[in-house]
Swiss-Prot record:
<feature type="binding site">
    <location>
        <position position="128"/>
    </location>
    <ligand>
        <name>Zn(2+)</name>
    </ligand>
</feature>
<dbReference type="InterPro" id="IPR033910">
    <property type="entry name" value="GluRS_core"/>
</dbReference>
<dbReference type="GO" id="GO:0000049">
    <property type="term" value="F:tRNA binding"/>
</dbReference>
<dbReference type="InterPro" id="IPR020058">
    <property type="entry name" value="Glu/Gln-tRNA-synth_Ib_cat-dom"/>
</dbReference>
<dbReference type="InterPro" id="IPR004527">
    <property type="entry name" value="Glu-tRNA-ligase_bac/mito"/>
</dbReference>
<dbReference type="InterPro" id="IPR045462">
    <property type="entry name" value="aa-tRNA-synth_I_cd-bd"/>
</dbReference>
<feature type="binding site">
    <location>
        <position position="241"/>
    </location>
    <ligand>
        <name>ATP</name>
    </ligand>
</feature>
<keyword id="KW-0547">Nucleotide-binding</keyword>
<keyword id="KW-0030">Aminoacyl-tRNA synthetase</keyword>
<dbReference type="Pfam" id="PF00749">
    <property type="entry name" value="tRNA-synt_1c"/>
</dbReference>
<keyword id="KW-0648">Protein biosynthesis</keyword>
<feature type="short sequence motif" description="'HIGH' region">
    <location>
        <begin position="10"/>
        <end position="20"/>
    </location>
</feature>
<dbReference type="InterPro" id="IPR000924">
    <property type="entry name" value="Glu/Gln-tRNA-synth"/>
</dbReference>
<dbReference type="InterPro" id="IPR014729">
    <property type="entry name" value="Rossmann-like_a/b/a_fold"/>
</dbReference>
<feature type="binding site">
    <location>
        <position position="101"/>
    </location>
    <ligand>
        <name>Zn(2+)</name>
    </ligand>
</feature>
<dbReference type="GO" id="GO:0004818">
    <property type="term" value="F:glutamate-tRNA ligase activity"/>
</dbReference>
<protein>
    <recommendedName>
        <fullName>Glutamate--tRNA ligase</fullName>
        <ecNumber>6.1.1.17</ecNumber>
    </recommendedName>
</protein>
Length: 472
């Protein structure tokens, strides 16, 4: 058996969305599972809509997901000479012909067919027309599609699919301006690049019989095809921006880990028993096309958040820290003056579903604040809190070995000494140290904030209470 070779071939007319990312992942996994090769091809024949910005977005998304490619990126716009050479060869062999039909004729034909309830298709007027035309006249080139028989292919996901050749008209393969069309470029690329398995969305099923017929006319091998179902929103409608169908890089910006998004995407159609959590190594080992479901999958943001929370708390903190550093930088926080990011992840991981949420909630570890949260201060920085804060300040100041255990002992001994519950000490201390009413355990939080900064903030809270007393 020849080496398995797959490809991901996006059109750079927009960002890399989740559907495209899933297709890329499935193609990548199939090649990696079979120790084959994965090709990246940019199908940029739509010159009006293709942009460099979109190409960059595709590359950024692939790199962020760590879907590396063995060949490419190939660009179709750089291969026009090759496509036109193949078209000229087909003209010589009689597998293609020049069509001189005017736009007006084709539009009138279409209107007549639709009025008669027929499927619009080219009527073959120039297919066997003996009339001679000057090749310099404006014309397109059409593929001479077989008029009898059927195209049958065994879809690796859906099983046998059959199209009657009578349903397929003669496809334009070169436009009037001399540029080759999408369906023809795809065929030549898959042939030249020795693609063995084409894994793509179900919206390409109708292109497949046309492409197979062109491949056969060229004497080229026909690859295996696998068409994955679309992704729906949780309301059963086609996924769109209102469902959260944004670019892959938007998920990065929103604080998702690539491992979480990959795990989520692989399960949108593929399964292995009841298993939900898959490392990339497990995906590679277990992946197969016959385990992909034919039916559409529904996108569920809550499930993605659950997976992201799982990976935040189970991946090596050093790995998560690399991604968290970017989010903290986006918040304008200098993380050099505070706890190590690996320690921050251990502190906040259980409380945060995304890295963005973590970055937004960690500022007090690295920067002083000008004021306390109004509700938290009103509730906990009252005159009754002055004595607990003064006593715990003294005990914290006397610590020579700043550990979570010693911090906890200082808080506990303050409560014991004043004969009050831990909350009477811990809550005012939390608000004093963090500026807010919620945080991880007050002892580990204060330990991470550090001794000098904690003592300074307690003094700030005592001043706040004193001002409050004078105003009352």
């Amino acid at each position: 058996m020849s080496k398995i070779k797959t490809r991901f071939a996006p059109s750079p007319t927009g960002y890399l969305h989740v559907g495209g990312a899933r297709t890329a992942l499935y193609s990548w996994l199939y090649s990696r599972h079979n120790k084959g090769e994965f090709v990246l091809r940019i199908e940029d024949t739509d010159l009006e809509r293709s942009t460099q910005e979109a190409i960059n977005a595709i590359m950024d998304g692939m790199n962020w997901l760590n879907l590396n490619w063995d060949e490419g990126p190939y660009y179709q716009t750089k291969r026009f000479d090759r496509y036109n050479q193949a078209i000229d060869q087909m003209l010589e062999q009689g597998n293609a012909y020049r069509c001189y039909c005017s736009k007006e004729h084709l539009e009138a034909l279409r209107e007549t067919q639709m009025a008669n309830g027929e499927k619009p298709r080219y009527d073959g007027r120039c297919r066997d027309n003996p009339c001679q035309h000057d090749p310099a006249q404006p014309h397109v080139v059409r593929f001479r599609n077989p008029q009898e028989g059927s195209v049958i292919f065994n879809d690796q996901i859906r099983g046998p699919i059959e199209f009657s050749n009578q349903e397929l008209d003669d496809l334009i393969i070169r436009r009037t301006d001399g540029s080759p069309t999408y369906n023809f470029c795809v065929v030549i690329d898959d042939w030249d690049m020795e693609i063995t398995h084409v894994i793509r969305g179900e919206d390409h099923i109708n292109n497949t019989p046309r492409q197979i017929n062109i491949l056969k006319a060229l004497g080229a091998p026909v690859p295996e095809y696998a068409h994955v179902s679309m992704i729906l929103g949780d309301d059963g409608k086609k996924l769109s921006k209102r469902h959260g169908a944004v670019s892959v890089m938007q998920y990065r910006d929103d604080g998702y880990l690539p491992e979480a998004l990959l795990n989520y995407l692989v399960r949108l159609g593929w399964s292995h028993g009841d298993q939900e959590i898959f490392s990339i190594e497990e995906m590679t080992e277990l992946f197969s096309l016959d385990a992909i479901n034919k039916s559409a999958s529904a996108f569920n943001t809550e499930k993605l958040q659950w997976l992201n929370h799982h990976y935040i708390n189970t991946l090596p903190p050093e790995k998560v820290a690399v991604h968290l550093a970017w989010h903290i930088e986006q918040q304008g926080i200098d993380s050099r003056n505070g706890p190590q990011l690996v320690d921050l992840i251990k502190l906040l991981g259980e409380r945060c579903k995304t890295l963005k949420e973590m970055a937004e909630s960690c500022r007090y570890f690295y920067e002083d604040f000008a004021e306390f949260d109004a509700d938290a201060a009103k509730k906990h920085l009252r005159p009754v809190a002055r004595q607990p804060l003064e006593v715990v300040h003294a005990k914290l100041a006397s610590i020579t070995d700043w550990t979570p255990e010693n911090v906890h002992h200082a808080i506990q001994s303050t409560a014991d000494e004043l004969e009050v519950g831990m909350g009477k000490v811990g809550m005012p201390l939390r608000v004093a140290a963090t500026g807010a009413g919620q945080s991880p355990g007050v002892d580990v939080t204060i330990h991470a904030i550090g001794q000098p900064r904690t003592l300074s903030r307690i003094n700030q809270a005592l001043e706040f209470i004193a001002q409050r007393e004078t105003q009352s």
